[in-house]
Amino acid sequence: MDRRNDYGYRVPLFQGPLPPPGSLGLPFPPDIQTETTEEDSVLLMHTLLAATKDSLAMDPPVVNRPKKSKTKKAPIKTITKAAPAAPPVPAANEIATNKPKITWQALNLPVITQISQALPTTEVTNTQASSVTAQPKKANKMKRVTAKAAQGSQSPTGHEGGTIQLKSPLQVLKLPVISQNIHAPIANESASSQALITSIKPKKASKAKKAANKAIASATEVSLAATATHTATTQGQITNETASIHTTAASIRTKKASKARKTIAKVINTDTEHIEALNVTDAATRQIEASVVAIRPKKSKGKKAASRGPNSVSEISEAPLATQIVTNQALAATLRVKRGSRARKAATKARATESQTPNADQGAQAKIASAQTNVSALETQVAAAVQALADDYLAQLSLEPTTRTRGKRNRKSKHLNGDERSGSNYRRIPWGRRPAPPRDVAILQERANKLVKYLLVKDQTKIPIKRSDMLRDVIQEYDEYFPEIIERASYTLEKMFRVNLKEIDKQSSLYILISTQESSAGILGTTKDTPKLGLLMVILSVIFMNGNKASEAVIWEVLRKLGLRPGVRHSLFGEVRKLITDEFVKQKYLEYKRVPNSRPPEYEFFWGLRSYHETSKMKVLKFACRVQKKDPKDWAVQYREAVEMEVQAAAVAVAEAEARAEARAQMGIGEEAVAGPWNWDDMDIDCLTREELGDDAQAWSRFSFEIEARAQENADASTNVNFSRGASTRAGFSDGASISFNGAPSSSGGFSGGPGITFGVAPSTSASFSNTASISFGGTLSTSSSFSSAASISFGCAHSTSTSFSSEASISFGGMPCTSASFSGGVSSSFSGPLSTSATFSGGASSGFGGTLSTTAGFSGVLSTSTSFGSAPTTSTVFSSALSTSTGFGGILSTSVCFGGSPSSSGSFGGTLSTSICFGGSPCTSTGFGGTLSTSVSFGGSSSTSANFGGTLSTSICFDGSPSTGAGFGGALNTSASFGSVLNTSTGFGGAMSTSADFGGTLSTSVCFGGSPGTSVSFGSALNTNAGYGGAVSTNTDFGGTLSTSVCFGGSPSTSAGFGGALNTNASFGCAVSTSASFSGAVSTSACFSGAPITNPGFGGAFSTSAGFGGALSTAADFGGTPSNSIGFGAAPSTSVSFGGAHGTSLCFGGAPSTSLCFGSASNTNLCFGGPPSTSACFSGATSPSFCDGPSTSTGFSFGNGLSTNAGFGGGLNTSAGFGGGLGTSAGFSGGLSTSSGFDGGLGTSAGFGGGPGTSTGFGGGLGTSAGFSGGLGTSAGFGGGLVTSDGFGGGLGTNASFGSTLGTSAGFSGGLSTSDGFGSRPNASFDRGLSTIIGFGSGSNTSTGFTGEPSTSTGFSSGPSSIVGFSGGPSTGVGFCSGPSTSGFSGGPSTGAGFGGGPNTGAGFGGGPSTSAGFGSGAASLGACGFSYG
């Protein structure tokens, strides 16, 4: 029979009106205590009885009638029939008041035992039979009879009950012994019939009396309590009117004793009838009349007639809750009769007739009238006495509590509110109910703490914890506050132990603990459980992939493939069958069910409730996909189901979180829930069952508690952490310090000695980090923040008023309007803030990286006055802002440079006099990369006036701009050059006389890159005559040919250059004397970018000697080659630099003495960005760089490398800094005496000094995805401009890095809409302008490139909306000056992409290998495959 209530049993639905509050055990309000009135009791009884009326008639017991037997032993059997329910009756006190009372003295009874018992949940109809045996000749036979009677009449349960015995002599009736059982008063329980046994004394009366007493004592009936109402009633209170059951046993004495042994004394229990009584007196009447006539026969063998009676005395009929119980008691008379079969048959027939109808047949009764007449007076007196005693005792029981006794096997605990509990289920007893204890938060928290320890102990076995166990073992009388106690415990578990309490079965109230730290498989458990949970994941995946169920045969087929077989013990899993069918089932990981109607029985496995909470179908699907090396979408049905479950689970999680937060707020649950000491000594293991403990005697040794208890609140040097979502006034962490994680306004916060750290997007007033220092992450309105003694740092604040970093220094990352920021002693730095009023970088200086409106010194600010990277007299620079005045990368006089900004005045990269350069800006005036006089250059801008890359007089050059006037890359006289435009007049890259050059045009006449007589050059076009790149005598150059003789980029004597060829002799980019250069060739000798004496650079070659980008003395540079010596970007003595090479010596960007720089190599000496004496720098090498003025020792950028020493970003005395190295020692971002700091070591994803609403920027090395210095609206930027995605100085495995752009998604030193570029070694880098996607000087396997010897996707000096262009040595997918297999570009391998076309080119490759498509034409022309390939 299905029977579950809140604790595992079902309650029938109520048919009547709802009961009053509190009558069904529902919690009272804490400040209200109610009492149940008489009307409430009547109403409740009516409701319960009406609800269970039908259920009473459902399970009639089976009537077993004995067959006639000729044996000497005849059993005494009972026939029990359930009585239907009756209408309600008035309350107990009315019954007791209206009934005439009989005093104990008037009754004068000898002994009357009254037993009051209550049992939970179910009502039992206990049919008891008392056998009165006449005295036999042998006394030992009597013991056997009474023992059997006791066995048949025992109660089915062994729970305790309160017993009150009232004794009084029954002198008036003068009865020998009367045993009366008065059962527990229950509001809707019927009166129990009393067993009345009369023994007529035979010969040995004393023994017969003892036997009868034993039989009576063993025939005790237990009635079950039904509900928990507050009204006290007694046995005599009757909710349903029942008819009295008259059972008479007539014995006829006969002289024939031979057949007396076959006499059968049958006890017949008939159905009760309902009699509606209008008054309380009739409603309380319960009479049991019994008459026993014992006629002694002459022979003693009749004693065997009752020997088998006790075996079937008691039949138990269970009825649901709130049913009427009528216990019929049988009177067994053992008769000694003489022989005479007629008398026996008459008596049997009379009894059978009487059991069928309440009105017995008069004819049958007449035959035994003489026997009834003899006992009629006795029956009347006994009935009156019993009723009087019940009525009198009724009032007493309503005032007296029950006593508690302890049973050995099953213990029952009774609570203050009248609850009586046994096992895992209990119910409330209305007459014993008391009001719930008052709500005391301290006591509730104490119970919650105990519950936490209780749950942690119980969860060790992973068997779900029952709510009833928690109520019984921990919460006890505070069960009214169970929701609040368990919520407090759940909060403590989350905050202290990082586990969540989940109710997996609301019907059975089962709870589990789930850790917030998942394993890779998604299933959670300790280390010792890992093998089992791995096996569980296999089983779950099989079930899920087979339609959410799997037969046992399928499971074993899979397990056999893993070497697991039933019956074979495994070293890790033990008995596998027991593990998957018993342990996992108990832990609710699996369900193991029999297939319906299967013959022989078959079983199936399903997911258990715990599995749905500890993992998900998506995780299991991915697990299966990893095993089979497939994509989850290959299983469309399972994938769709997993996605739906994920969405549903997410919605449920959000709803539960909101509901829990609201509930906790209403209950006032907060940080106090985790306060207070924790003592595990008061926790025993009695709460564990034998099943959970197992056979281990030392149970505690099986449990390991990994507890991360937090420091106590309000202790010395305590921490104050605020995780609230509401407004927070102040939060302190560690000695007054505070840390605040909130999305609402935060006034103040401190971290470590008054400092504070604030994480949030709402207005943040003040935050301090480390001794009144502060750091603010993402606050919308950040007023003030300090970092390291009045210093502050602000990340992404919209409105940042003042920030300081390191002694009133400040740094602002992406704040829109930044009023003042100081970085290192009054200095300030603003990274891409649109409105930056004043920013200083290193001692009063101001620097803005990407700010739109920067008053003083802005790297990409609109109005930037001056910025110096160590050069002597420079005016201003702006990296990708609108208005820029001047900038100098070590040049003597440089006016302005604009990396993608609209109006740019002048810029000099180490040249003497340079006017302006614009990388992608519209109007660009002049720029000089180390040349003497340079007017303007525009990389992709509309109008460009002049540009000089180291040449003496350069007029203009336009990379993809429509009108291009002239450009000189170090040559004396340059007129014009167009990279990809339709009409190109003349271009001189430093040559004296240069007529024309067309990069991709159909007809190209002449081009001279600085060479004196330069006739023509064609980059991939059909007709190509000559090209001189600034050399006096330039013979020939071929971009993509196998053998290239000479090319001069501005140098006087230039011998040969091969862009992608195997052997190169010489190339000069504006240098006076240039020996050789190889752009990805194997062996290159020298290259000079407008520097005076330069030996050799190799852009991707294996061996390179020297390169000078405008520097006076430059020794060697290698962009991707293994050994490189020196490079100087405008500096006087520059020794060596290597972009990805193994050994690099020196690099100087405008500084005086520079020793070495290595971008990604193992060993490198020095890098100087404008500082006078700079020792070493390495961008992922073992040593370190220095970016500073003054005596900066060393710096290590170590992007992905192990050991970086130090770095200094600023003047003064900087000691060291490590930016992302594995073992980076220190970093100092300021002047004065700053010692060390480390920014993003090891595996940093992104960090930087980047711009506006930038997503990720920084100097991040290792496995950093993006790094940079800039960006206005870029997601991540280097030193760059507007909409830069990701760029910077990233080495190692960085994705992209660059120095700025205007609207580029990622850019190097350029503007436009470039995607990714920069100076980084390994993946990508770029140096360029316009609307190119990916370009740069990078080495390694680039997706967007530079001068590399490894596969690169795209780079180059291209203009217009070209996709991918670059100088790459390896396989390039885009277009560029590279060798090796490239899909499009200037490479030696296969090239498939587009070239330098002015129109919509399909693809072109200036490579030495096979080129699938070339389009160096204007318009929509596509020349098809290019023939300049050798691979």
Swiss-Prot record:
Could be involved with bystin and tastin in a cell adhesion molecule complex that mediates an initial attachment of the blastocyst to uterine epithelial cells at the time of the embryo implantation. Directly responsible for homophilic cell adhesion. This is Trophinin. Residues 1342-1363 have a biased composition (Low complexity). Residues 751-1430 are annotated as: 62 X 10 AA approximate tandem repeats. Strong expression at implantation sites. Found in the placenta from the sixth week of pregnancy. Was localized in the cytoplasm of the syncytiotrophoblast in the chorionic villi and in endometrial decidual cells at the uteroplacental interface. After week 10, the level decreased and then disappeared from placental villi. Also found in macrophages. Keywords: Cell adhesion, Repeat. Directly binds bystin, and indirectly tastin. Sequence repeats lie at residues 751-760, 769-778, 779-786, 787-796, 805-814, 823-833, 841-850, 859-870, 879-890, 901-910, 911-920, 921-930, 931-940, 941-950, 951-960, 961-970, 971-980, 981-990, 991-1000, 1001-1010, 1011-1020, 1021-1030, 1031-1040, 1041-1050, 1051-1060, 1061-1070, 1071-1080, 1081-1090, 1091-1100, 1101-1110, 1111-1120, 1121-1130, 1131-1140, 1141-1150, 1151-1160, 1161-1170, 1171-1180, 1181-1190, 1191-1200, 1201-1210, 1211-1220, 1221-1230, 1231-1240, 1241-1250, 1251-1260, 1261-1270, 1271-1280, 1281-1290, 1291-1300, 1301-1310, 1311-1320, 1321-1330, 1331-1340, 1341-1350, 1351-1360, 1361-1370, 1371-1380, 1381-1390, 1391-1400, 1401-1410, 1411-1420, 1421-1430. InterPro entries: MAGE, MAGE_WH1, MAGE_WH2, MHD_dom. Residues 444-642 form the MAGE domain. GO terms for cellular component: nucleus; plasma membrane. GO terms for biological process: embryo implantation; homophilic cell adhesion via plasma membrane adhesion molecules; negative regulation of transcription by RNA polymerase II. Residues 405-415 have a biased composition (Basic residues). The gene is TRO. Residues 1-24, 341-365, 401-433, 1342-1365 are annotated as: Disordered.
